[in-house]
Amino acid sequence: MDWYIYSNRLWTRRVGGREVAIVHALLGASSAAMNLEELIAYGAKRIYEVGVSGAIDTRLRPGDVVVLKGAFSDEGTSRHYFKGVRRFRPSLRPTRVLQASLRECGIEHVTGDAWTTDAPYRETKRKVARYLRAGASIVNMESSAVFAVAAYRSVEAASVQIVSDVVSEHWEPAFHAEIVNRRRLDVLNAVLRGMSGGQAEERRRARPA
């Protein structure tokens, strides 16, 4: 069944015996939160975010894959769920499933933190330096809100990001580069594979001896 939430097309399919929803979300933390609230209300229990991010660690290059271990909130949505929390974390179990699936699919990746902002044109040198010191390697506009909503609603969430540009003295955009588009598709296929394999493994473990 194909339908829409907040003007975003939603595809539902069965993967590994489970119903899976895929939605192409709009840009930004508030949009991500609205999408998640709807999906969770419809019964979603595990969220995998596949996104694109700018690299602030210039050792990363367009097309590189980063599995998030945390996200610093510099946006206005997550504070409506948890006041005073600076860094949000993904759920451990789906993050492990995600990393295992990427390895099985031969997709090289690293782990790192994201800096999530509402103001991409205010990514100043001072802010970039601050978040680099804090441990962030990429910047995006959604991940901290994704983790915040998931934690508040008691569902699991993990995130994998593809580097789409490099934020430095000389901005290096590569949003529509072949390597970025190809890697996004590869990663999405790996996520779907992981959801199928991970759920099958959970069912095997749940069976009585």
Predicted regions: what they are:
Residues 1-96:
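Metabolite-binding pocket within alpha/beta catalytic cores that recognizes anionic/polar moieties
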Residues 1-4, 106-113, 198-209:
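Flexible, glycine/charged-enriched surface loops at secondary-structure junctions
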Residues 40-41, 132, 151:
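Non-catalytic positions within long, well-ordered alpha-helices that form the structural scaffold/packing
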Residues 45-46, 137, 156:
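Short acidic/polar active-site loop segments enriched in Thr and Asp
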Residues 167-209:
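His/Asp/Glu-rich mid-to-C-terminal helical/loop segments that flank catalytic regions of hydrolases
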